[in-house]
Regions:
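Metallocofactor- and cofactor-centric catalytic cores in central/energy metabolism, strongly enriched
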Residues: 22
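Alpha/beta enzyme core
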Residues: 1-19, 29-192
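Small/polar loops that bind or transfer phosphate-bearing groups
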Residues: 26
Length: 194
């Protein structure tokens, strides 16, 4: 929420810790300060991962602005950064520009910080989705996500998820974390082949 205060974020993190949530996503300006003594395991025990965004929600920021925003978030202590691609480049089939943008951002978000790339799949053809996923794999993105949920065209479709899963499978990058057969069964119930 744009009106969120530091107190709101602190309360969100406390609630996430209490509920055992793995992560909370906050605006870059609201990334909480790291504990004064990070070696104090009591201070960090059960604390959720801090995720944030860059180029959100439109993806229309200049590449260097996105990379700078992402790098600043890393320096503030973000554990994960979700970045929105410039979907116009994907629609136009400008794979080189897309790869260049993603490489610049990956350099700004060094591992072990997690880089998640958000596509707006509701706007993309099958080939554009496949090209975006291949670009994400090529630059070492850790995750590829279907949509921001903010675009008027809509969010994820099962077809888009299947296309992305197929492309990730080809690159041997499709994994199910922590759920194994249950995940496959659940996705199967939704009609997704994983």
């Amino acid at each position: 929420k744009p009106e969120a205060t530091r107190e709101d974020v602190d309360a969100l993190i406390a609630e996430a810790r209490e509920l055992g949530c793995g992560a909370v996503c906050v605006s870059p300006s609201m990334i909480p300060a790291a504990p004064a003594d990070s070696s104090d395991s009591d201070a960090t025990a059960g604390a959720p991962v801090i995720a944030t965004v860059a180029g959100f929600p439109s993806g229309k920021h200049a590449t260097l602005v996105k990379a700078t925003e992402a790098r600043f978030a890393v320096e503030l202590g973000a554990d994960e950064v979700d970045v929105v691609v410039d979907v116009a480049r994907a629609i136009a089939g400008d794979t080189n520009a897309l790869i260049s943008e993603l490489m610049t951002i990956r350099e700004a978000v060094p591992q072990p910080v997690i880089l998640k790339v958000i596509l707006e799949t509701a706007l993309l053809s099958e080939e554009a989705i496949r090209a975006c996923v291949r670009a994400c794999v090529a630059v070492g993105a850790d995750y590829v996500k279907t949509s921001t949920g903010f675009h008027p065209a809509g969010g994820a479709s099962m077809e888009a998820v299947e296309i992305m899963a197929d492309e990730l499978r080809k690159a041997n990058k499709l994994a199910s974390f922590g759920m194994g057969e249950d995940l496959r069964r659940n996705l199967g119930a939704l009609g997704v082949k994983a």
